[in-house]
């Protein structure tokens, strides 16, 4: 008998599998999805190995298969093991990242009364059992979750006992939608009737002209025609008449749900590269030609507009010439469209798209067509790193510094850039990171020769002959808003920004105004007692949205009516203060009434269709001004934009996070890079109340090296990454006192364990309330472990439930 080591969809230690015996009637292979019994439940598992001997003496049989064969390749299973071990997540959760859309089996148990039960009162052993059976009898079929809500937390054990007695029947079904290939009916001529059809066509009566036209269309077609379109074009009656004569055959054929269907991509050939671009490209291509040689990873640090995308295109082209395939990742779904256009134009019919903005059917078809080898390139956001690519040769991570590459809301809390490096190690691929403002840890690795550092120091513009030529960076001015106030200007626009906006619009150019805050005003506050309107579930200020007429929490989405009186002192002196994108857009429309202002934030653009529409409007000149948050700072190319105004650069600098300065620098660098990307020079105005801040000064000068040196000095002094590693432990609870007590108890246990083992190099910071201290109705306390190898402490301390472990957190808020 053979056995299988199976990762099961149940809470388990990281890296753990369970042994199951393989029944004779099942063919089980490594990488297959299966159903297995686990305690009283039936759960999904993924087979990690088929072995001759089990880990334990007694095993249970695999119940059934969930996939016809292997869904995961051996390198994907190895990657899952690494993710599980490194990020301290279950092995199943790690492997499930790579399953096809719809590949998760989320079991729900349904109970119904056994047909053998005639009299519930007679069958029950107690009044409680009778009420239980009567409830199921009334509702006929009830799932376990509904039983818990209606009859209490012990209902499942009661149901299990009644199933054993034969009074209830139970069935397990998946609660997730089962995805399949889309089948569409097609029509073709019956080959056995062609002779009869030919005779009829020679003598077809005039009244049957439409039928004859239909026959001609089917004869000329290279493949069967879709039935729905055929009936529309030639008439359902005519199709039916030919079917009655048995002249037609009807088949169900697989039809792909293609997210790029209907989009036109003009063919694009490779452009000439500058000498700097060619030098960088040659280095990357040499690495692709010699996959076993170091470095495994290249970091391209190029100023905004330096032509990094052309490097990516050239590298992917070389990868394909070598018979290998590529993954291209971007940090935001909003950026995928622009990237898709470039790659689909250069490599027609070879590009797949994978991100959460697609429909479930589109994701399913793109995943399977990629696995079947129909596509050589996958473009997508963070999750694209798990695309089922065989023979992988290259992974491109554009804007590699972006925090959105880190999964923060659920396990495993992986970083796609680090996963890319491990995947490349397992497959022999190369990784190409690109950024104008690299993550300081990435730049540190490149200086330590762990990455190959490639630099593009010059911005480029395309001349009239189509060749790229060096172009100046936009001129940047810092405006001290404290001085504006002293001189009597209380407007949100400084006098300099106002003058620059007027000149920009008068010249027929476009402009971007950036503010890292949504809504109309940040806060509603009582001027009598100082009380600030805050979310009842989350410990953060509510944001006022004028058009909705509501105060909205940007964390949990709760909407609140605007109070007439202060809930604290019952006074009437409520005042709005602060600015958001909506109020900036409205102020701009008031200042320049003939200007069309577009707004881009998560309130105005909810899905990928909204993104595409807005980008197209701005690209074609329908809007002269674009107001937005972080999304407009990331890699977008609008040649007509000559002015960028940063309305308030200070937002985010005061957040209690060691990376606040780095994030501010990166955002300001990126948004400044949107100006002057065409033939006309660009200008940037940064408004701030902290004009001497090192991050603001360095971003204005587009001086990454200066910022890096100061930031690294601060981090070395405080022992923060890359000089040490961090692990964040977050505990949540509905009761504040319980949350604090549990956090302090765990911190004491860790301190005792650290001291007992003599690993004093690990600091235990906290516990302290997280920021925000309350979120979605749950209080939050966290502990941060800092040291050369802080996870050594976690190997000896078992965390209770309701704790979340974040390895290498990108934020401590």
Per-range role (PLM):
Residues 168, 248, 351, 476-478, ...:
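Generic structural signal for residues in well-ordered beta-strands
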Residues 268-278, 282, 293-740, 782-784, ...:
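Inter-lobe coupling/hinge segments of SF2-like helicase ATPases
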Residues 89, 100-110, 115, 124, ...:
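C-terminal accessory/connector segments of nucleic-acid motor ATPases
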Residues 1-435, 442, 447-471, 772-778, ...:
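Accessory, non-ATPase domains that flank or precede helicase/AAA+ motor cores in DNA-metabolism machines
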Residues 151, 218, 588, 671-675, ...:
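Hydrophobic, Leu/Ile/Phe/Ala-enriched alpha-helical segments that form helix-helix packing faces
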Residues 81-84, 148, 585, 589, ...:
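Generic solvent-exposed, charged/amphipathic alpha-helical segments
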